[in-house]
Design a protein with these regions (language model features):
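Exported/periplasmic ABC-transporter solute-binding proteins
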Residues: 1-131, 136-320
Length: 320
């Protein structure tokens, strides 16, 4: 669905095609929502978030704010007033500037922390879901697993040929992500740690996560590329990604594959938490939204969308 890639949500398109809910990346709640907002849209939380988390925060938002009384364009636009899909860096900037009251993102980069500090804004982080950071290569690449040490060597430039890690005698084509993106922040902080990365070539930094994946898949005839992203984005995000999945594979790390079971039990090495971030003293309506997401009903939505919940999902919500 194009709504996944749009800068903001096509609420009208969604409203007129409820049967296509799945293609818009939205998931129904089980049972009646335990939280409902009033008709006073000015008090609703303003929810911004990264692309990979869109199916989560949009599904919740549309179930918790009132349905428009009229199906005219104005009512529909007001309902989408508080929802904006963006990139991680822009979501943080929106929170710092005050246009967003809660954002759904990965952990902040050093640059984002510094900008908040300079603006005199203290941020509050609430983890609510678990996610894996994964490495993708062409489906024909003979390498199926890398050690953490080998990953560092490849992305620092110390290892530049696949045959050094059990692959073909080919130069490794390393793909990076832009600074301040959620993926690059995790790559530097969790994976590389104190090891400097290769300088990113301009041609290999792709702005959209989907773009990175498309580029890796394009190299199937010379299977020499490696890139990184989030597990959910490449396995569940939308139809285009699923088509690409037939041309790429996810590498095991230290022999442990990034399956949902291994994410849940913590054996896969590169696990990250997804966060809701607010200012230090959020509005009461924003705090209710955050609290709902870590409640049993909110955690059930996390699980139903395809992420791994951090807390217990609702045991009594097995019925619709």
């Amino acid at each position: 669905g194009t709504a996944l890639l749009a800068g903001c949500v096509d609420r009208e398109g969604y409203y007129n095609s409820v049967r296509e809910e799945e293609s818009h990346g939205l998931t129904s709640l089980r049972g009646q929502p335990a939280l409902r907002y009033s008709d006073d849209w000015s008090r609703w939380p303003r929810v911004y978030g990264a692309t990979a988390l869109y199916p989560l925060y949009a599904s919740a938002y549309y179930k918790l704010v009132p349905e428009p009384k009229d199906k005219d364009r104005t009512s529909l636009a007001w309902q989408a007033y508080g929802l904006q899909q963006t990139r991680t860096a822009e979501a943080y900037d929106s929170l710092i500037k005050g246009s967003a009251t809660v954002i759904f993102v990965a952990q902040p980069s050093e640059g984002q922390k510094k900008r908040a500090e300079e603006a005199g804004v203290k941020l509050k982080y609430t983890a609510f879901a678990r996610e894996a950071f994964v490495f993708i290569v062409d489906i024909n690449n003979p390498v199926n697993s890398l050690s953490e040490h080998q990953v560092k060597d490849i992305f620092s430039g110390k290892t530049s040929r696949w045959n050094k890690v059990g692959g073909s005698d080919e130069h490794i084509k390393v793909w990076q992500r832009p600074e301040d993106s959620g993926s690059q922040t995790i790559m530097k902080g969790l994976v590389m740690q104190d090891t400097p990365m290769l300088p990113a070539k301009k041609s290999t930094v792709i702005d959209l996560m989907g773009g990175l994946i498309t580029e890796v898949a394009d190299y199937q005839n010379t299977p020499s590329s490696i890139g990184y992203t989030f597990h959910y984005y490449v396995t569940r995000m939308n139809d285009n990604m699923l088509k690409m999945r037939k041309q790429i594979k996810l590498l095991a790390i230290n022999g442990v594959a990034p399956t949902e079971e291994n994410i849940r039990n913590g054996t896969y090495p590169y696990i990250v938490d997804a966060y809701m971030v607010t200012r230090e003293n959020p509005t009461p309506e924003t705090q209710k939204f955050v609290d709902w997401f870590i409640s049993q009903q909110g955690q059930q939505l996390v699980e139903d969308v395809g992420y791994v919940p951090l807390y217990e999902a609702s045991p009594e919500s097995s019925g619709q």
